[in-house]
Amino acid sequence: MPIIMGMDKQEANGTDKTLLVFNCHEPWVYQLNALDYKLDIIVGLRGKYNKGWDYQMRPLPTRARLIGLPEALRSPTEYYCIIAHNTTDLLDARSRPEPRLIVLHHTLEGRIQEEHSSIDPDKMKEMLHTYVELVGGHVVATSMFKGESWGFTDDIVHFGVDADDYPPYSGHEAAGLRICNFISSRRQILLWDFHERAFEGLPVTLVGHNPDMPGVEASRDWNHLKQMLQAHRFYIHTADPRFEAGYNMATAEAMATGLPVIGNRHPTSPVKHGVSGFLSDNPKELRRFAKVLLEDRGLARMMGQQARKTVMERFSLACFKHAFLRSIEIARRKWRTRKVAPSSFTIDDLPFTNCCR
């Protein structure tokens, strides 16, 4: 696997600590760039739609290299911490002798819904709690909404977005934008029937990996994605409050660019109705709001500026860096309290949720 060029120069200027990171959602992994650690990112994982790094979503972090799981397991590097995203990752890394943490990116209910699983959610929570306590692991949730779903609310670390990474809003293209992967398998979670009723016949651009949807493609790269965000009039996010949060990283990116957001009402939505976007559970009303923004670029720009302020206040990359560095130190302390070695567990000891793959 390739090592990113220029790493030696970066190593001379930064920390020598290295994290072992299972690949997950590339935009989330990319923000680890802010930590200024070296990153060994494990690719070629079972169940992930692509075998390498998805450069259509993000470039590789500056101090990162890509490795396979076998290489990671036999690496002589003393990793400062292992970053996992599901129980499969935890068990795959069970032979490694370093501290570890798992990041919860989804609600338990959402994963069960998407995977059509018959597992008892209470049993799943109990087993994960028991496992991390025994092996001295640490759990980080990306929002309180997701942490409460799993019963882990002690360490909430919101993702970070640097608003300065995004070009200023134009909105010259009178169309809505939605970025989403694998819509067909997540229709209920995304309230897709509601989305279709609200926006059918209106100019809306869908972006993402959706091989069963003709004409829908992922961005060419991050710069192309930024250009699309800059050009479109507003952004769309709909989600079932039982399964999914009222925002995601793409929503925050859109807000950072200065797009107002349109969607259903959700207790966790960062959108303030009538200020930074429009929210409604009535598809006809939401459609009317969309038409207002399509016809009034000035209003869209004004509301988008409020959306941008919200992102800068709530999803600062500096705050993410501070919080996640703290999470790593907590994981290192907990590792010293482990009761059993992770290697004592087998593949049959935990039910699996391939949360990000």
Label the model's feature ranges.
Residues 273-284, 292-297:
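Conserved acidic donor-binding segment of nucleotide-sugar-dependent glycosyltransferases
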Residues 41, 149-152, 160-222:
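Conserved catalytic-core segment of nucleotide-activated headgroup transferases in glycan assembly
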Residues 226, 248-256, 269, 275:
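Short alpha-helical segment that forms part of, or immediately flanks, the ligand-binding pocket
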Residues 70-76, 108, 116-139, 146-147:
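Membrane-proximal helix-turn-helix segments that form the acceptor-binding/catalytic region
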Residues 256-263:
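Short hydrophobic beta-strand element within catalytic cores of glycosyltransferases
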Residues 230-244, 259:
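Acidic donor-binding loop of glycosyltransferase active sites
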Residues 40-45, 81-83, 95-122, 139-141, ...:
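Active-site proximal beta-strand in glycosyltransferases
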Residues 284, 295-337, 342-345, 351:
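A charged, aromatic-enriched C-terminal amphipathic alpha-helix characteristic of glycosyltransferases
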